[in-house]
């Protein structure tokens, strides 16, 4: 059958478009995709129903962490593939490019007061990765290495999706560290963040141990 012109495509409209893209635009897009660093807002309110699960927490969170930072999201076009491969691979020391990206993120972070120390969260999946990242940040940033915030032996497994039950499982999960002589902001490092409750509860442990109010969560990925 004979077709009729639709008037929309370049053949019908008589307009030809080139596939060429301005090199400056390509460079700008590539730079943006490869630039690490995203803000992670802290939790501001306790979940409803905490009293029903036996924890007397309600209202506004006053002892949580400050705004955190990650290299990127696992779904990102830029860093996403690299970070997924890193977290899916067997545990290993932090690769040079990931350490460099982390340092770049921290260098661009608007701190009122420079961090004085860095600490890693205990991990059952990436203890070597987190520990080596803490060591690298301590060396590059000349920060005090506080080691690892260790889990208690009797801690509950965190399996619930419900926020109240996640907080319940994380409550009293860590051994209170010795922060004697630490005066100033602390970087708290983990591999990945999802709900934000792990850092919220871990920050409370550091605050009870005498940490400065400015605890900066530092994740590899979200």
Where are these regions (language model features)?
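DG-centered beta-turn motif at the end of beta-strands
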Residues: 189-192, 196
